[in-house]
C-alpha cells in the first residue's frame, strides 16, 4: 500500500488463491509455529475432495471443547481481519480505482506436489482452487489496467473468473 502497488503475484504454493482487495490489515503474531502446525494437521484432514465448511469467520464456532482447538480457532478468527477487505466499485469483473492490494498465489505449475485446501476458507480469499492439476496465469497489462486469467494445463479451462483492476488515468 505504501508503495502504491496494485497486485502481488506470488508462487511456490501448492494451491491457487486470489484475495479480495485488501487495505490496511493488521498482523497477528501470538501463535507459535508448532502450535499452529499441530492444529492445522487436524483441519487439513479433509479427504480427497474437501469442501469448504463455510467461509470464515462464520465457520469458527465452538467446534470442540479442547483448549488447544479453542486457541487455534481464536487465532484463526484474529487473522480473518474483515476490516482489511476493501469495499470496491466494480464494473463487470473489474474493480475500479481500488486503493488496496490484490494478492494472487499461483498453484503448482510443475504438478510435482499439491496440498489439499483447508476446509475453513479465509475471509480475505475471493477464490481458491485445487484439483491436483497444474495451472498457469495469463496477465495482461495496459496503461491503466491489469487483467488476470488462470487456467488448468490439462484442458485449458479457466479455474477462476477473469479479474481486472482498472485505474483512471492521471
Name the predicted role of every residue range.
Residues 141, 165-167:
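Generic beta-strand structural signal
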Amino acid at each position: 500500500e505504501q508503495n502504491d502497488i496494485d497486485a502481488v503475484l506470488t508462487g511456490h504454493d501448492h494451491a491457487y488463491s486470489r484475495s479480495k482487495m485488501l487495505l490496511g490489515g493488521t498482523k497477528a503474531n501470538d501463535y507459535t509455529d508448532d502450535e499452529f502446525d499441530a492444529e492445522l494437521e487436524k483441519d487439513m484432514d479433509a479427504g480427497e475432495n474437501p469442501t469448504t465448511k463455510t467461509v470464515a469467520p462464520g465457520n469458527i464456532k465452538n467446534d470442540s471443547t479442547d483448549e488447544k482447538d479453542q486457541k487455534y480457532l481464536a487465532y484463526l478468527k484474529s487473522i480473518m481481519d474483515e476490516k482489511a477487505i476493501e469495499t470496491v466499485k466494480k464494473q463487470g469483473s473489474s474493480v475500479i480505482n481500488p486503493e488496496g492490494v490484490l494478492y494472487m498465489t499461483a498453484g503448482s505449475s510443475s504438478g510435482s506436489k499439491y496440498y489439499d485446501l483447508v476446509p475453513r476458507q479465509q475471509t480475505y480469499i475471493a477464490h481458491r482452487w485445487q484439483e491436483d492439476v497444474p495451472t498457469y496465469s495469463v496477465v495482461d497489462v495496459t496503461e491503466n489496467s491489469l487483467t488476470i486469467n488462470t487456467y488448468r494445463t490439462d484442458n485449458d479451462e479457466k479455474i477462476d473468473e477473469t479479474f481486472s483492476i482498472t485505474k483512471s488515468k492521471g
